[in-house]
Amino acid sequence: MQWRRKQIKNIRQRKVMKLHTARLRKANWNLTLSMSDAKRGNEIVTLAESTLIRFIDNAKGVDTGGIYHRIDELKSQAARIKNGYEEDSSPATLKSIYAEINKLLLVPEYLLLVIDSEADYQRAVFGFTVNGITYKRLLATAAGVKTSTIIFVADYLKPELLQKLNNGRDMIKPAVPSKLESYMGLSASASKPVSMPRGVIVVKDCYMRFKDDYLLLKDLDDSDEPYIEEVHQGDVEVDNSDGYGLASPALIERWTAELEEDGPVGGMCIRNAFCKGMVFPFDFYEFAGLVANSDTVIDVWGHEQNIYDAELILTESMLKLWDSYKSCEDYLANCKENGYTFSVTKIVEPQQHESRELNYQFIQPFEMTDDDIRELIAPTISDISGVMGGDPAKALLYLRGVDQTEDSAARLSDDYAQAIAIDPDVLNDNYVRGQISKLISKRADRAKLGRIRVRGDFNVVSGDPYALCQSMFGLEVTGLLPRGTAYSQYWNERGVNEVLAFRAPMTNGHSIRKIKLVDNPSCRWWYRYMRNVMILTGWDMTMAAENGCDCDKVYCHARQ
């Protein structure tokens, strides 16, 4: 499933080697490889800048920003040479410029190793050499494990990198090794640093307790199959703040400017040492004055904190190893000492779309008549027929894959698609019609597999920030959203009062939730900064039904 979060602009790219263990095994774990040969063998890959890459630059005494500044200078010089604005425009000069750019982009101390066999892995962890550099295993990311890819680093840098990655945590505190490595792996996420907030508070998660009906799966000692028990009005505890925190609107605005994004932004996915999750803009200062009548909150360590001294509120589910530090001040001091900063990986997209494709999992649980099926596939059939029938608007819409806007031509990737945007008569050209016909054939094949267009979109999900504020100020937790409801500024503005929620991978029909959308002055006021976010109530089991999702994303099919 796609994220309804957008990769932020201008994350710089670096290059690293990516080798298979079989390649090293054949070289007796001591490989000499020229960069030209590595490129020809697709053994040089591009990675987005990350905290780990910044750590490696820092350990080498290199300024990461200085690298990009020099690369930009060299690219400008190359452009001037190509345009005839430089006296020395020889091919040798251009070649030397590109060679320097490639050298600056490469991080030779960072190597991705693809494990071809268990025996190879057991040998690789003892270390190997490539071009005179000895590499040792550093960590595996959650995404890397799925593709048998492990991060190795230059042996001489590993102790310093591990010290930074551990970030002064209490090493005596027990930690599950797999989880600890997963948390350390956050340092390899593509991210862009942002300025330090003017104060941070870490608060306890907001738990909401109620009774509900649910299915309980139990493992049986004498059977390989689980036992399903129907529980009626059983006790339920929901973490309504799982994976998200709050940021002052001013902080989100400042970070948006630093990221060179177009505002307003309804939320950001952030990283720091052992810290991950979404933060959403919410005026907790206003809540303190109008609702709590207090400026004091108790943080997760039990310390009193003044809410007006903070721009960022983290929850314990975001700061994974909070209990390995004495206080928030201790945590932030270690971050500063080890070179950690807050950084942003993705943002909530400022623009949503009114239609998206389903997948077969979302359709399978429904029992539909022939008429139901005809109604469901009608928009998709209309798209295909319209394009083949020469409708310029539908052709343009299909080629872009998203809703049409006036400035669409500037963003179209294919020449013939741009041509249609400029002159619709291009559709009469045999070549263009042939190309579109090939694409439509593929589109029809996808539709047969359940990729049906309906009115709906992917939405970033949040718990109720009003309830979180009630919790952190020690008030009775009620929230603003009753059971079975949610709030969506985007869909409310379009007159939608009910949605169906799905989340992939979807295993059964119980994961489809019908949700009524609340729209009242109180919700509109308190949630006014959270554009394009689906805010869920904490008084039902929607998050559990959506395969135990935390505050990330869900597909919503709009119903009116």
Regions found by a protein language model. Name each.
Residues 1-542:
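Conserved small-residue
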Residues 543-545, 556-560:
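Short active-site loop/helix that positions an aromatic residue
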Residues 553:
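Duplex nucleic acid-engaging cores and interfaces of nucleic-acid transaction enzymes
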